């Protein structure tokens, strides 16, 4: 294993580690604790690690990501009585840095061997290349978390400031004041209408499947199999692909975004979306644009029949839910497309103008 010392600075090292929402513990010895996490490979990370290569898991998943292992030991207490932690970080098996940091740690809401940590007041330490541990000897987490993603949600009503959000996809929003994801989810009583084996119950996933033919990956940056990283269980799998609110219908063959779309996908899903047959569907809110969190889906889509008359959406089929702040941050940390939308909107004039 060839490892180089990273040129990362103290503040950037802290930012990298604090960008991770959930760490998985893979070893807990009396004198050593080992944590690991997986996260998307962002542009700024490439600047911190010269020639960084993507993590190549054994399963061969095509995902641009970092696999980080932290080796934690506790030196003697300082004169102030505080007990700092010595951190050796190995990134993608090729880059390393060492810190002496104050660390706050607590069990994550996922349970098991998962933790949320926060490092601060760090100092860079010499990185002894000859004594670096080999992360290839450590296991990769394999438990899929959460077992039931709805355990990280609750029923919601529109917030008092429903316009302070960005639309992530039709029927899903990032609400900035609470830093949470609001989204429409299929009611349990309606699941029997879904085709056999159907397991993605978010509004955006069902609308996309109804509108888009299969297979269709016309926009690779939204190909979730390539882009998602598991920031819940830190496995080598795609993690939150089933319930991440980033799926959007494709418009590349249908003209401008405001153009009504003709359903070309799974027609058995019609009853979940509208109370009658529709020839065209118009999205009233679009990803990356200012949004509004409504109480029902009538402000998300509009349908028209063959005679041009309006067909009401099936508002009774959907509940407005919100993810916990913890789960919302894990989704944000694991989906580069969602991160891009949220960060770009936060920097945009339309959001700042309301401050």
Curated annotation (Swiss-Prot):
GO terms for cellular component: host cell cytoplasm; host cell nucleus; viral tegument. It is found in: Virion tegument; Host cytoplasm; Host nucleus. The keyword Nucleus does not apply. The keyword Repressor does not apply. InterPro entries: Herpes_UL16/UL94 (IPR004286). Keywords: Host cytoplasm, Host nucleus, Late protein, Virion, Virion tegument. Its main location: virion. Plays a critical role in cytoplasmic virus egress. Participates in the final step of tegumentation and envelope acquisition within the host cytoplasm by directly interacting with the capsid. Upon virion binding to target cell, a signaling cascade is triggered to disrupt the interaction with the capsid, thereby preparing capsid uncoating. Belongs to the herpesviridae cytoplasmic envelopment protein 2 family. Interacts with cytoplasmic envelopment protein 3 and with the capsid. This is Cytoplasmic envelopment protein 2.
């Amino acid at each position: 294993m060839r490892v180089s010392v990273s040129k990362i600075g103290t503040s950037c090292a802290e930012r990298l580690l604090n960008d991770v929402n959930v760490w998985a513990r893979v070893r807990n010895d009396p004198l050593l604790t080992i944590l690991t996490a997986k996260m998307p490979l962002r542009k700024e990370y490439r600047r911190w690690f010269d020639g960084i290569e993507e993590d190549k898991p054994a399963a061969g998943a095509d995902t641009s990501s970092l696999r980080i292992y932290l080796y934690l030991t506790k030196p003697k207490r300082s004169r102030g009585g505080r007990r700092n932690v010595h951190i050796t970080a190995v990134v993608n098996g090729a880059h390393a840095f060492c810190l002496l940091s104050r660390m706050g740690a607590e069990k994550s809401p996922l349970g098991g061997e998962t933790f949320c940590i926060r490092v601060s007041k760090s100092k860079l330490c010499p990185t002894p290349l000859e004594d670096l541990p080999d992360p290839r000897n450590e296991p990769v987490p394999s438990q899929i978390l959460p077992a039931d993603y709805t355990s990280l949600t609750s029923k919601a009503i529109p917030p008092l400031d429903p316009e302070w959000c960005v639309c992530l996809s039709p029927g899903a929003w990032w609400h900035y004041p609470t830093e949470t994801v609001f989204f429409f989810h299929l009611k349990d009583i309606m699941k029997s209408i879904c085709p056999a084996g159907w397991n993605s119950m978010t509004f955006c996933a069902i609308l996309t499947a109804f509108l888009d033919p299969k297979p269709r990956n016309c926009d690779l940056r939204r190909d979730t199999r390539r882009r998602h990283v598991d920031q819940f269980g830190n496995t080598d799998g795609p993690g939150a692909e089933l319930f991440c609110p980033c799926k959007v219908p494709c418009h590349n063959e249908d003209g401008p975004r405001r153009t009504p779309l003709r359903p070309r996908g799974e027609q058995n899903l019609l009853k979940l979306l509208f109370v009658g047959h529709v020839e065209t569907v118009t999205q009233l809110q679009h990803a990356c644009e200012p949004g509004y969190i409504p109480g029902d889906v009538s402000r998300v889509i509009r349908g028209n029949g063959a005679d041009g008359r309006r067909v009401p959406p099936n508002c009774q089929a959907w509940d407005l839910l919100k993810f916990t702040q913890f789960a919302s941050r894990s989704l944000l940390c694991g989906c580069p497309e969602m991160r891009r939308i949220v960060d770009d909107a936060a920097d945009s004039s339309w959001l700042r103008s309301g401050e």
